[in-house]
């Protein structure tokens, strides 16, 4: 099983599937289609049925029930795209038999995965790790999840003695830019419950997510030759800087944890005439979330009072909501996942997602979908890695969930 997981993850990782928030297509990038078509062929090869890809790149497949009992149809999902935070081109995964200490990812560039900066690394002594080469992200988020689902389905097909109901599988595009389920056909997927395999370290089990919004704030100034600019030039960049300075410094991602929400300035672009600032807003509490959006709007109003109505324009949209509200009424699905982990001597770590998953949106579309660990660490950057042993445990958790649904029906 470990060899299958290694081969699958490395193969998937080498396909550049970074999404693009500026694209209007679904999937947002051609590379996602490349992986989707590859996975379609692989699903057929391992023996899955009802394999379909729609015009938007949503790949679905079925493992038919092998039981005559009335077992709820469950689903497992992972996303094919990787994050835009760091380059995902020419990913060159490395396999490390880790014996402790620091890992030199790239000797030439002096990129070191250190136990000082990442103390959790020490706990992986004796594990086989898949790392980056220090120049790209790895893409274990969420290609480790794809590998785990694929390997679990292959195992169940090869072991028909394991009783299970109908299992649906889906691989989806554009999760990293918040559009994952936007065109997902829940009725076509036709599962009663589902799980995303999109978490991090061993034991993560999550059914709470952020409420999330994104804001694009455009500042308009007046560009004049600097030699004759007195009393004429209005520098949009300076107005943007004044706006940014209004946000509480301690309410940023680098200063928050647990249930603490934040404002996150993700990018700035512009010149004297026009500057664009992009924020994301996050909070687990719905009321606090709405208050944060109101605060941003108030800061914009303050700018208008000082510089005029046309000096600033805010476009803000909600991206997803906390899935807890939709999962708590069917919390048995969380308990089943927890039991599956405990049967493998895994201690479930039930904590809120400081982010979102496709399950955040799917839960509001009528498909309650908690999130399960992949075994990965340090997603979205050059220090990303995943434990092969913990990938195997994630795979066995998927198998265990399928077995428990059958046993409890």
From Swiss-Prot:
Protease recorded as keyword: yes
Reactions the enzyme catalyzes: Release of the N-terminal residue from a tripeptide
CDD domains in UniProt: M20_peptT
Subcellular location: Cytoplasm
Broad class of the protein's primary localization: cytoplasm
SUPFAM superfamilies: Bacterial exopeptidase dimerisation domain, Zn-dependent exopeptidases
Enzyme class: hydrolase
Enzyme Commission code(s) on record: 3.4.11.4
One of the record's GO cellular component terms: cytosol
Annotated residues for binding of Zn(2+) 2: 141, 176, 380
Residues the record marks as active site: 81, 175
Textual note on the cofactor: Binds 2 Zn(2+) ions per subunit.
Cofactor(s) needed for function: Zn(2+)
Coiled-coil stretches noted in the UniProt entry, renumbered to this chain: none
Gene Ontology MF term list: metallopeptidase activity; tripeptide aminopeptidase activity; zinc ion binding
GO BP field: peptide catabolic process; proteolysis
Keywords (A to Z) from UniProt: Aminopeptidase, Cytoplasm, Hydrolase, Metal-binding, Metalloprotease, Protease, Zinc
Ligand binding (Zn(2+) 1): 79, 141, 198
Similarity annotation: Belongs to the peptidase M20B family.
Purpose: Cleaves the N-terminal amino acid of tripeptides.
Entries under NCBIfam families matching the protein: peptidase-T, PRK05469.1, PRK13381.1
PANTHER family given in the database record: PEPTIDASE T (PTHR42994:SF1)
Name by which UniProt lists this protein: Peptidase T
Provenance organism: Oceanobacillus iheyensis (strain DSM 14371 / CIP 107618 / JCM 11309 / KCTC 3954 / HTE831)
Gene symbol of the encoding locus: pepT
